[in-house]
């Protein structure tokens, strides 16, 4: 099973991916945690480009979309190969490119070989709350920009059947909702939920 956490910066993706992976391990599952960009050479190049001053220009966004698609192929062989019988929990997946690098049709085409998650959990949060969590220091943490990203995430969630979780609450409440979503997929009874 491939589980992906999506959401704007500051929504808690990294925290909840780690907590979910830990919970699944406690319930006897072999779990692999991944993130996008990955730790591959391509992922390192992506992180470098994301921190450049021109990261939001159209040409750099197109380059990033192509690099992200290539980076996802480094995951595909693991997810569909060695890890096929295990659980993969990811902090982002190809849906991030749809909201950050769009337009949607082009991003779908270049990601046609990217692994598709079985479950996507969108951690939805108000832009101002997310910016407070992040400290508002990142180039991508501009309120108008993030509001557009959030809106695109909500549209994708509606169109693609993501589970949407209110991420403005405390960690335990958010994690409880995530576990309630995932428990039926794993045959975990309610006693295994916070």
From Swiss-Prot:
Gene3D superfamilies: P-loop containing nucleotide triphosphate hydrolases. It is an enzyme of class 2 (transferase). Keywords: ATP-binding, Kinase, Nucleotide biosynthesis, Nucleotide-binding, Transferase. One of its GO terms (molecular function) is dTMP kinase activity. ATP binds at residues 7-14. InterPro entries: P-loop_NTPase, Thymidylate_kin-like_dom, Thymidylate_kin_CS, Thymidylate_kinase. The keyword Lyase does not apply. GO terms for cellular component: cytoplasm. The keyword Calcium does not apply. It comes from the Archaea. Belongs to the thymidylate kinase family. It comes from Methanothermobacter thermautotrophicus (strain ATCC 29096 / DSM 1053 / JCM 10044 / NBRC 100330 / Delta H). Its EC number is 2.7.4.9. It catalyses: dTMP + ATP = dTDP + ADP. CDD domains: TMPK. This is Probable thymidylate kinase.
């Amino acid at each position: 099973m491939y589980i992906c956490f999506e959401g704007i910066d500051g929504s808690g993706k990294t925290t909840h991916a780690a907590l979910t992976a830990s919970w699944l391990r406690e319930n006897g599952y072999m779990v692999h945690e991944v993130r996008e960009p990955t730790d591959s050479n391509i992922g390192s190049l992506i992180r470098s480009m994301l921190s450049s001053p021109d990261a939001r220009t159209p040409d750099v966004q197109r380059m990033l979309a192509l690099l992200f698609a290539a980076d996802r192929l480094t995951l595909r062989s693991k997810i569909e190969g060695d890890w096929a019988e295990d659980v993969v929990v990811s902090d982002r997946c190809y849906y991030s490119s749809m909201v950050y690098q769009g337009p949607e049709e082009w991003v779908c085409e270049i990601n046609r070989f990217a692994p598709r998650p079985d479950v996507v959990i969108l951690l939805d949060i108000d832009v101002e709350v997310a910016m407070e969590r992040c400290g508002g220091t990142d180039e991508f943490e501009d309120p108008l920009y993030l509001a557009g990203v959030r809106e695109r995430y909500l549209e994708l969630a509606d169109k693609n059947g993501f589970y949407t979780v209110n991420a403005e609450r405390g960690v335990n409440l958010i994690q409880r909702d995530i576990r309630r979503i995932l428990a039926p997929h794993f045959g975990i009874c309610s006693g295994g939920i916070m």
